[in-house]
A protein has these predicted regions:
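Conserved kinase catalytic-core segment
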Residues: 26-45, 96-162
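Catalytic-core segments of enzymes that bind and process phosphorylated/nucleotide-bearing substrates
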Residues: 81, 85-101, 142-196
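Long, highly charged amphipathic alpha-helices
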Residues: 37-38, 181, 202
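Acidic/polar loop patches that form or flank catalytic/metal-binding clefts of enzymes
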Residues: 48-53, 134-135, 194-196
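Conserved ATP-binding subdomain of kinase catalytic cores across diverse folds
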Residues: 1-93
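Short, glycine-/Ser/Thr-/acidic-enriched flexible segments
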Residues: 3, 25, 69-71, 129, ...
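Small/polar glycine-rich anion-binding or flexible loop at a beta-alpha turn
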Residues: 57-59, 197-203
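Short coil/loop linkers at secondary-structure junctions
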Residues: 48, 111, 190-192
Length: 203
């Protein structure tokens, strides 16, 4: 309940829909706090992300909550992940790369501006070491006028990735991605070099 802060697992009139995550048994206790920090970093970088909350619980436990963006007025909002849109198996590292992400974004949204948004997400993931960047962690959502666009960023946090590699590579590189490779990716996104440079420096 946004008025009282009370919550329930049952669908209740007047309540907002949120997802609440707890650390898995094999995860460090601070993973929820780290994801909250990353959510704040996304906002500081001007990247759209859902409202979030961090809960410090008894016995050293914690939880991270994010408001669902696939719900509006109690109804489902059409959404599809990059994996669903392309038919890619997100469990296979390297099945898609960031160029595929840009091109899929252009195909799904029919809006070149959304490719620039997708490029910005790539920059953040590289700069902030989010290597859990598989195709299920990007999505497209339908606006009220029926237009597809990139969803808010979600499941963004520090992740070492499989053997230190990003799940999606940038211009063939998935381990040590350089500024030069990011600028080449910007060309694919039709982002001018000077604009891309400012985006990289800003993040």
């Amino acid at each position: 309940d946004p008025e009282t802060g009370r919550f329930t697992t049952a669908v209740t009139a007047g309540f907002e829909a949120w997802l609440v995550k707890f650390p898995a048994k094999e995860e460090h206790a601070e993973v929820c706090a780290i994801e909250m920090v990353y959510a704040e970093c996304l906002r500081m970088c001007g990247i759209e992300t859902p409202d979030t909350q961090y809960f410090s619980l008894p016995n050293g436990l914690a939880a991270f909550a994010s408001k669902r963006f696939d719900r509006r007025d109690g109804l489902r909002v059409p959404m599809q992940s990059l994996a669903a849109f392309t038919g890619a198996n997100y469990r296979s590292p390297g099945v898609l790369d960031y160029v595929n992400f840009l091109r899929a974004t252009q195909m799904c949204t029919n809006d070149v501006r959304e490719m620039a948004v997708a490029f910005e997400r790539a920059v953040f993931n590289v700069a902030f070491n989010n290597r859990d960047d598989h195709p299920k962690n990007f999505a497209y959502i339908m606006s009220q006028d029926g237009q597809w666009r990139l969803s808010p960023a979600y499941d963004v946090t520090f992740c070492e990735g499989p053997s230190g590699y990003h799940q999606m590579d940038v211009m063939g590189e998935a381990l040590s991605i350089s500024r030069t490779q990011m600028l080449r990716l910007a060309e694919e996104a039709e982002v001018p070099p000077d604009v891309a440079g400012r985006m990289i420096d800003g993040i």
